[in-house]
Swiss-Prot record:
Highest taxon, organism lineage: Bacteria
Compartment(s) of residence: Cell membrane
Entry protein name: Uncharacterized protein y4yQ
InterPro entries assigned to the protein according to its UniProt record, in alphabetical order: YscD_ppl_3rd
Residues annotated as transmembrane: 82-102, 117-137
Keywords: Cell membrane, Membrane, Plasmid, Transmembrane, Transmembrane helix
């Protein structure tokens, strides 16, 4: 790529509206797949949706999937390439992206702070094979702030405030855990560290849609500005059968009475499930790290 020209983009519609960036790659692959250069999820993109190549002050757009159009030029069929003058708006899936170039000489005169990144990736992580998953931002360059007062001087990268990121991630993780608990997803646990929210656990095929809705809630709450590492998988292990509880004692040492026998917290049942805790109207059982709620 010509060092005097950089390719910039701005999302002008969709979930990531107003997101801006600068890519240092001469050719960038855009899609929802993990191996794309710029990855957007929840926007109806194919894993490899389209490819852009900067050619001076024009942009070559190659359609790799259906559902792509250039404003003013109409739809582009899969496999077709179109060269358009910059700036240009590309419509893909549920989003629209404005692409433009800016000379390096003029970029230093802009006083408004602008995010400059070599690759912006919303990296899809986790193996939940249904719906659309959450995203994680991965910046391969430090953010650079332009300042009109620094004329002729080298710009230094502005390092992120890790403490602020950690506090934001911790607050978001706490809210996400509450939402997960409200959805009855007892096998999902949330943690936060170094500005990243991590999700681990399992869901059944029946409860997968509930987890999908929680992810959508998180995405819209954070507007894609917070990293979410998704480690949730589908596990359809057979749930324990109903418990024929004869009596329940919920005092300082709670226990169940089943077939005349007392089962305290930590006791093993016949099918290998362990009594995790006793709650009002239900017993939480655990086996191999999985929790199951059984009413009584």
């Amino acid at each position: 790529m010509n060092d005097a020209i950089s390719l910039q983009f701005k999302v002008i519609s969709g979930l990531y509206c107003e997101l801006t960036g600068t890519t240092a790659l001469e050719t960038s692959l855009i899609g929802s797949g993990l191996d794309a250069d710029i990855v957007f999820v929840e926007q109806g993109l194919a894993p490899h949706h389209f490819r852009v190549t900067l050619l001076g002050k024009t942009l070559e757009v190659e359609a790799l999937a259906a559902g792509l159009s250039i404003e003013g030029n109409g739809n582009i069929a899969a496999g077709e390439r179109v060269v358009a003058p910059l700036p240009v708006v590309i419509h893909a899936g549920a989003m629209s992206i404005l692409w433009s170039v800016q000379d390096a000489a003029s970029s230093g005169s802009i006083g408004k702070p602008r995010l400059s990144i070599s690759v912006l990736a919303l990296v899809l992580l986790g193996s939940l094979g249904i719906g659309v998953l959450s995203a994680i931002f991965s910046y391969y360059d430090n953010a650079v702030v332009s300042n009109a007062d620094l004329s002729g001087e080298a710009r230094e990268p502005k390092l992120p405030d890790n403490r602020t990121d950690d506090e934001t991630a911790f607050t978001a993780a706490k809210a996400l855990q509450q939402e997960v608990d409200r959805a009855g997803l007892s096998n999902i646990k949330i943690s936060a560290a170094e500005g990243v929210v991590t999700v681990e656990g399992t869901v059944t095929s029946a409860s997968a849609i509930s987890w999908h809705k929680v992810q959508q809630w998180f995405d819209h709450r954070t507007r894609g500005a917070l990293a979410l590492l998704n480690g949730v998988i589908i596990d359809d292990e057979k749930a324990p059968s109903a418990i024929a509880v004869e009596a329940v004692w919920r005092g300082s040492l709670p226990y169940l009475v089943i077939k005349g026998e007392k089962y305290f917290v930590g006791a093993l049942l016949d099918d290998g499930w362990m009594v995790e805790r006793i709650e009002d109207g239900r017993v939480m059982l655990s086996r191999n790290g999985r929790l199951a709620a059984v009413p009584y």
